[in-house]
Amino acid sequence: MRRPSTLRIALLSGSLAVLSVAGFAVSQMLPLPAHPSSAVTPQGLLSKSFDDSAPNAAQVRRGQYLVAAGDCISCHLREGGEAFAGGLALNTPFGLIYTSNITPDRDTGIGAWSSDQFFRAMHDGKGAHGEDLYPAFPYPWFRRVSREDDDAIFAFLMTLPAVNYTPPKNDLAFPLNFRTLVGAWNTLFLDSHNFQSDPEQSAEWNRGAYLVNGLGHCGACHTPKNSLGADKSKQELQGGKLDNWVAPDLTSNTRIGLGDWSVDDIAEFLASGRNAHAAAGGAMADVISYSTSFISDADRRAIAVYLKSQPASPSVAASSPDAGAMRRGAEIYSDACASCHLDNGVGQSRLFPPLGKDAMLQQPDPTGLEHLILGGTRIGVSASRPSPLGMPSFAWKLTDQEIADVSTYIRNSWGNQAAPVAVADVSELRKKLNLQTVRLTDNSGDH
């Protein structure tokens, strides 16, 4: 249940992806429902109180908490739609998959489902009538969730307002539009093992492992995939790519992962979307807003403890940047970036993040930085950080060459070291994002 995107056979966008963002300058509002029936906000549904007199109040409250931990809203909320009603288009390499309606509407949602059918969907990827569900629904991770927790999630979903809405039909390339092929995918790649605690580890570590590898489904985004959308062997949490964003490495690699982050740093990031190292944008903004800001301090810390125990990914050698690109990039940075991030790249703590030794900026694949500069982003909001700040798009102002140069400069300044950015890659991404081109190229004034 996460906001995804370009995942292979469409594995969902990772719930606990740590996406570091380079800056924020303008306020942006979260999309609001288009219909009066949606007066209850997604955050309101996640914080709603339940009467203790109800026979299953404790189970429903637990389900409400687990739905937040699984970040269900981020995927099952389309722009302008009602929470949990689905209809969000997941842009996968194989076509579009639309998320389902999981409100208790009997005709278009899951109101006619039994708890057994719901468990089978979560555990085996099977629909109400036994049909195979596409792995855009991350059952490869949810199958590790206990039956007790699945039943609690189902109990909470049954308390939601029923929304009569049918999402559009999927638009997948032949032959992937035949669900029978998913069965073959499951045979090849689906891990049949349920979650097992490690007796050699602490209770806190095991709780973190349960969340990261189960409801949190972090690997859906942060583990690289093969051509069929399955996890690459022995590369858990070493970074992935989806919907023209990069989900960074979450291992202990000190340059491109979480090696320089403490347990407290990770927990703070999950609570507020900001810490001394980074701020959450892209798909991670929704994870903060609808998921990790709602879970307990203890669970955020458990996740952090587990992530800090992951072995570092292999080091990646970076080629030296061209001196001309660095010189041009420095000039562009001074004009377009330094007002927020300062000339020395230190930014302003927990407002405009520092750019030096930034893991996301040094990822082997620079698509995330290119996307950030071209399209801008918003930061996730939370109770502790309610201001909906964002970084504006520079597509209107900077040419592809200028974006390549300033990206190369940022990726190789203040202790950073990463491969140069190719102008052809920026041009290709601009086309994919359908962003305007710049009319002038001197970068000396209004365009």
Positions of PLM-derived features:
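N-terminal type II signal-anchor transmembrane helix
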Residues: 2-39
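Flexible coil segments in periplasmic/lumen-exposed cytochrome c-class electron-transfer proteins
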Residues: 32-50, 77-97, 128-209, 213-214, ...
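Short extracytoplasmic
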Residues: 45-73
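Aromatic- and charge-enriched surface segment that lines or borders ligand/interaction sites
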Residues: 108-126, 130, 259-263
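Glycine-rich, acidic and aromatic/proline-enriched surface loops and short helix-turn segments
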Residues: 124-127, 272-276, 375
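Extended, polar beta-sheet/loop recognition surfaces of beta-rich domains
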Residues: 270, 291, 356-405
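C-terminal structural cap/anchor segments
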Residues: 330-371, 387
